[in-house]
Amino acid sequence: MDEKILKFIRKMHLLSLAVLDDGKPYCASCFYAFDEDNLAFIVAGGEQSAHVKAFLAEPCVAGTVALDTKIVGKIEGVQFRALAAPATAQQRKIYFARFPYALAMNPSLYALSLSWVKFTHNALGFGKKLVWQREQI
């Protein structure tokens, strides 16, 4: 993955997650930590929350991470596709290192393993986009 994409993902902390809930679209905002070794967002969610129930039933998800700005020249963000699954022990460590206060809540954690990312960064040139796709094995 291009370092410009990774740098943006590292500096942000909130994503918008889109899932299908019984065939209907549903969105949720999630704080995230990022597993750079596996290129996965790590998010928390209660097992009874709508977005978790939805991606446990249909693990293909999509989402965005965007810089909040009204200045066109500073627009920056990613759109992504991913597969959701329970987080590994190592991913739990990554999440709690970023959000140590979450330990007290003992949340269920999930990894959104990236399969495709489109990064828009107008500071690189208006409408400049970088696309990354995971190699198929």
What are these regions (language model features)?
Residues M1-E3, Q48-H51, K93-Y95:
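Charged, amphipathic alpha-helical segments
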Residues M1-L15, I137:
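Extreme N-terminal tail/first-helix region
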Residues E47-Q48, S115:
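A generic "binding-loop/recognition-motif" signal
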Residues L6-K7, A33, K53, Y101-A102:
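Short secondary-structure boundary/capping segments
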Residues M12-E47, F55, V61-A66:
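Short beta-strand segments
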Residues H51-A82:
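Helix-adjacent hinge/juxtasegments
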Residues V72-I137:
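Charged, gly/pro-rich active-site loop segments
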